[in-house]
Amino acid sequence: MESEQMLEGQTQVAENPHSEYGLTDSVERIVENEKINAEKSSKQKVDLQSLPTRAYLDQTVVPILLQGLAVLAKERPPNPTEFLASYLLKNKAQFEDRN
């Protein structure tokens, strides 16, 4: 029985070519997904450069600017430029994934 379990264990290890480095199947999947996302991201950056000005702005800064301006209009701070700059810096992570 133990020899069967050892054989099963060895079979599982043999299925994962990177097991000798301690990489599990889930880690390998994560790495592959990251590679694919990086390739898509680099293709997207090239696409952004080829867009007309209006389309480029609509896809990059208009969404966060509209949200920031809406908050600015609602709160009406005494220093609106600094408020908007601060808002953009604080919330840019929410919108960077969309680009």
Swiss-Prot record:
There is a cross-link at residue 35 (Glycyl lysine isopeptide (Lys-Gly) (interchain with G-Cter in SUMO2)). CDD domains: DD_DPY30_SDC1. The keyword Ubl conjugation applies. InterPro entries: Dpy-30_motif (IPR007858), DPY30_SDC1_DD (IPR049629), Sdc1/DPY30 (IPR037856). Residues 1-26 are annotated as: Disordered. The keyword Acetylation applies. The modification N-acetylmethionine is found at residue 1. GO terms for cellular component: histone methyltransferase complex; MLL1 complex; MLL1/2 complex; MLL3/4 complex; nucleus; Set1C/COMPASS complex; trans-Golgi network. GO terms for molecular function: identical protein binding; protein homodimerization activity. Its main location: nucleus. Keywords: Acetylation, Chromatin regulator, Golgi apparatus, Isopeptide bond, Nucleus, Phosphoprotein, Transcription, Transcription regulation, Ubl conjugation. It is found in: Nucleus; Golgi apparatus, trans-Golgi network. Homodimer. Core component of several methyltransferase-containing complexes including MLL1/MLL, MLL2/3 (also named ASCOM complex) and MLL4/WBP7. Each complex is at least composed of ASH2L, RBBP5, WDR5, DPY30, one or more specific histone methyltransferases (KMT2A/MLL1, KMT2D/MLL2, KMT2C/MLL3 and KMT2B/MLL4), and the facultative components MEN1, HCFC1, HCFC2, NCOA6, KDM6A, PAXIP1/PTIP, PAGR1 and alpha- and beta-tubulin. Interacts with ASH2L; the interaction is direct. Interacts with ARFGEF1. As part of the MLL1/MLL complex, involved in the methylation of histone H3 at 'Lys-4', particularly trimethylation. Histone H3 'Lys-4' methylation represents a specific tag for epigenetic transcriptional activation. May play some role in histone H3 acetylation. In embryonic stem cells, may play a crucial role in retinoic acid-induced differentiation along the neural lineage, regulating gene induction and H3 'Lys-4' methylation at key developmental loci. May also play an indirect or direct role in endosomal transport. PANTHER family: DPY30 DOMAIN CONTAINING 2 (PTHR23356:SF16), DPY30-RELATED (PTHR23356). This is Protein dpy-30 homolog. It comes from Rattus norvegicus (Rat). The lineage of its organism: Eukaryota, Metazoa, Chordata, Craniata, Vertebrata. The gene is Dpy30.
